[in-house]
Amino acid sequence: DYLINKMRPFIFTTALPPVTLQWTSFVLRHLAEYQEKREHLAAISSNLRTGLQEKGYFSASASQIVPMIAGESSSAVRMAEELQRKGFYALPVRPPTVPEGTSRIRFSLTADVTEEEVKRVIATIRPVSSKS
């Protein structure tokens, strides 16, 4: 009785909501089916990183969230506006969210993105030497 009434981790533990349990159960049942999607996502993420690096942008990410470091806030805003004009949903990430001088565009890829769309994004982005 003492532990049941005094042990904080036990006292403040509650059961998971049913929706969370159902979702987890669904994911576990279907996990193996998504291997092809995971491989596609890894491939397009790698292709985007490579394309950005070839244009002179530093991108150290190893995930499907690929940053394109623009430097100054004004550069990130201009780049985002240019991508938006070309039909891409791109928002600048600026201080205080990131340190000064590291403003960026953050691409969050999903398995629904096509290789052609990645190629179009890369083609739209100007090399570092021609930023203005």
Question: Where do the protein language model's features map onto the residues?
Answer:
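Short gly/ser/thr-rich secondary-structure transition/capping motifs
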Residues: 5, 88-91
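PLP-dependent enzyme catalytic core of the Aspartate aminotransferase-like
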Residues: 85-89, 97-132
